[in-house]
Structure formats: C-alpha cells, structure tokens
C-alpha cells in the first residue's frame, strides 16, 4: 500500500550538499516523491568535505560529506537526507534509518580525457581505457581504491590526488594538470555529461566502491511519517547489493583509507535467484591483491530475509578476506597515510 501523502501544509524538507551532482540527486528524489503525491523542499548545505580540499586519505575522518547533512535531521532543519551511498559511513547510528535505496545507476568507473585530447586519437581498437595513455601518464583520482587498481594495471602511471566537485576536476584536467582523471560513470550520467571524452573500465579491471552508483535516503529513526513516505522509493535489488557490499566494508573496518572494492548483483540460475558478491582488498601500490567471490540463494517475496542474507554474504566474504590477511594489508595502508 502506498503511503498517505501529508497534508497540503506539510512538506518533506530534503537536505543535500549544494554541489551540482548532489543537487541533482536531491531533485531526483523530490521528483520521485512528487509522483507519490508528496510536496518537497530542497535544503542545500555545505559539508566539511566540500571545503576541506586536502586529499581525503590524509584527513583520517569519516563522514566528511554526510555529517552536516545528518545534523540537519537532528536539528529539524530537514526531514530527509540524500547521500551518495558510497559516502555514507557504515557504522550504525541509532538516530537515523536508511529508509530507501532507489534504483541504482551505473556502478562503473570512467577514464575521462581533456577536451581535444590527443590520446584518444593515438589508439584504435584499444581493449582497455588505459591503452590510450602513454607511458608515465598523469592520472588524477581522489580514491585509494582507484589508485591501487590503476597501479596494478599500469605501474608506470603517475597517479596524483585530485579533489573538488566534478566541474572543478574537469577544469583541472582541461588546464593540463592531468592526462586523464577517473570519475564515477553514475555522476557523468546524472549530470548529462555523456559528451565528455571518456572510456569505461570493465568490471574485471576496476571494481567499484561499496555502494557506488546508489543513493542512500536517510530519515530520523523517530519520524514514522517520513519513513513511510521514503520507503516507497526503495528498490529491492539495489538495496540488497549495496547491503552486501557495505557489510564487507563494515566488517573489515575499512573506512575511506583502505583500498577495498566490492560489487554485488542479483543473478538467476538453476538454483533460483542468487546474490553474487566479489570483493578485493589491495595494497596502495597495487602489488598485493586479495580477492573473494561468493554467492547465496535469496528467497523471493521476503524483504527482511533478503537483507539478512545480504548481511550473511558480506560477513562471509569479509571473513575469507581476513583469513587471507586483509587486516594486515589494511593496517599497512593506514600506517603509510
């Protein structure tokens, strides 16, 4: 049954960061709610992650992009908080409920080139996006996960830190600071920037961050009205995949420092519907890589059981990675940052 829209005098206030991508995400959620008869108001805010331009791995802080948005819920400045799910800390906070994960966008990473880049003309029939780059090319990324996978694929690359929103990063790219930068494909699609010169990494080359491409919509745990309104936006497949991925990150206590990558998806097999998960832990230089794959059959028409199974799968994969030495690898990465 669809939730009952609030009265005409009530609006759902949606808190978000004020970057163009974050605003798009909030407006997207507002449109979804409008289809269900709800009125909304966007509340743009500035997070610490938007003003602190140090490399993320050097800040050693969790929730750079989310704490200010969550505080708006606590202070009753907003009823709903919209996050990029990959930015939302995995540690539970009893004040909030992840009320919905809407349908997921692309989970892929993209190698983006400068306008009129000569690199795209230098190769024909390249199998990998990195085949377009010359020896020693400069590639920008703000992610240790991407850094590690780039260095594994191409040890010769000079991988450099980059911060800022999509537009800021593109400006640095076109100013000649980099030969290419890595961006989430989901952001390119959401900002309707598909005309950017870019190539997509296949999943066997670049595994995404836990929750990449998904939105996480939070409400206060004591706000039943907002919870009911947002629950209608939940997509079961997206939530299950993100739950399994985030469980790996949580069990390994990875945070933003560790090069941990995960990808989960639902597949149909002779055994029924299965939730499949691949996760890796790497050294920052890409020389060491631990990988685990597992799958579990999920029962149809039982959302609570599905979530429990996703947690079980994530816990299993994390344990196997830990048995292979993941804790030591993660500790080494932290010590070196």
Curated annotation (Swiss-Prot):
Q: Which residues carry this modification: S-(dipyrrolylmethanemethyl)cysteine?
A: 256
Chemical reaction(s) catalysed: 4 porphobilinogen + H2O = hydroxymethylbilane + 4 NH4(+)
> InterPro entries given for it?
HemC, Porphobilin_deaminase_cofac_BS, Porphobilin_deaminase_N, Porphobilinogen_deaminase_C, Porphobilinogen_deaminase_C_sf
Give the record's keywords alphabetically.
Porphyrin biosynthesis, Transferase
What cofactor does this one take?
dipyrromethane
In its UniProt record, a GO molecular function of this protein is:
hydroxymethylbilane synthase activity
Q: What class of enzyme is it?
A: transferase
**Where does the sequence pass through the membrane?**
none
Is Membrane a UniProt keyword of this protein? Answer: no
Q: Which terms in the GO cellular component ontology are assigned?
A: cytoplasm
> Any idea of its EC number?
2.5.1.61
- Cofactor: how bound: Binds 1 dipyrromethane group covalently.
Pfam family of the protein (one): Porphobil_deam
> What GO biological process terms are annotated to this protein in UniProt?
heme biosynthetic process; protoporphyrinogen IX biosynthetic process
> Gene3D superfamilies, alphabetically?
Periplasmic binding protein-like II (3.40.190.10), Porphobilinogen deaminase, C-terminal domain (3.30.160.40)
Q: In which pathway does it act?
A: Porphyrin-containing compound metabolism; protoporphyrin-IX biosynthesis; coproporphyrinogen-III from 5-aminolevulinate: step 2/4
Keyword Cytoplasm on this protein?
Answer: no
Note, other: The porphobilinogen subunits are added to the dipyrromethane group.
Annotated family: Belongs to the HMBS family.
Q: What is this protein for, i.e. what is its function?
A: Tetrapolymerization of the monopyrrole PBG into the hydroxymethylbilane pre-uroporphyrinogen in several discrete steps.
The subunit field of the Swiss-Prot or TrEMBL record says: Monomer.
Show the PANTHER family listed in the entry: PORPHOBILINOGEN DEAMINASE (PTHR11557:SF0)
What is the protein named?
Porphobilinogen deaminase
Gene encoding it? hemC
